From Swiss-Prot:
Keywords: Cytoplasm, Hydrolase. It catalyses: urea + 2 H2O + H(+) = hydrogencarbonate + 2 NH4(+). Heterotrimer of UreA (gamma), UreB (beta) and UreC (alpha) subunits. Three heterotrimers associate to form the active enzyme. It comes from the Bacteria. Transmembrane segments: none annotated. InterPro entries: Urease_gamma (IPR012010), Urease_gamma/gamma-beta_su (IPR002026), Urease_gamma_sf (IPR036463), Urease_subunit (IPR050069). This is Urease subunit gamma. Belongs to the urease gamma subunit family. It comes from Synechococcus sp. (strain CC9605). GO terms for molecular function: nickel cation binding; urease activity.
Length: 100
């Protein structure tokens, strides 16, 4: 299997996001890397599902609440930027203050 560096990065995000999802399902709070991976994964999947950049930017502020992350994490995550593949090409999606 030959993967580009970008594809390897996305695989790492997916792996970390699946771990984050399991921890959320067990009621555990996410740390900084887990929270960023989870948000990034949801952007990638939303783009794959056909959502627009605007939809993802709006929905992205509802995916994680402050009570789902460890203390201090919301203050560390001011924005999450992710390049995602849309039907009309690759676009940058930015989530501003996504943990509310």
């Amino acid at each position: 299997m030959h993967l580009s560096p970008q594809e390897k990065d996305k695989l790492l995000i997916v792996t970390a996001a699946l771990l984050a999802e399991r921890r959320l399902n067990r009621g555990l709070k996410l740390n900084h890397p887990e929270a960023v991976a989870w948000l990034s994964f949801l952007v990638l999947e939303g783009a794959r599902d056909g959502k627009s950049v605007a939809e993802l930017m709006q929905e992205g502020t509802t995916w994680l609440r402050q009570d789902q992350v460890m203390e201090g994490v919301p203050e560390l995550v001011h924005e999450v930027q992710m390049e995602a593949v849309f039907p009309d090409g690759t676009k940058l999606v930015t989530l501003h203050d996504p943990i509310r």
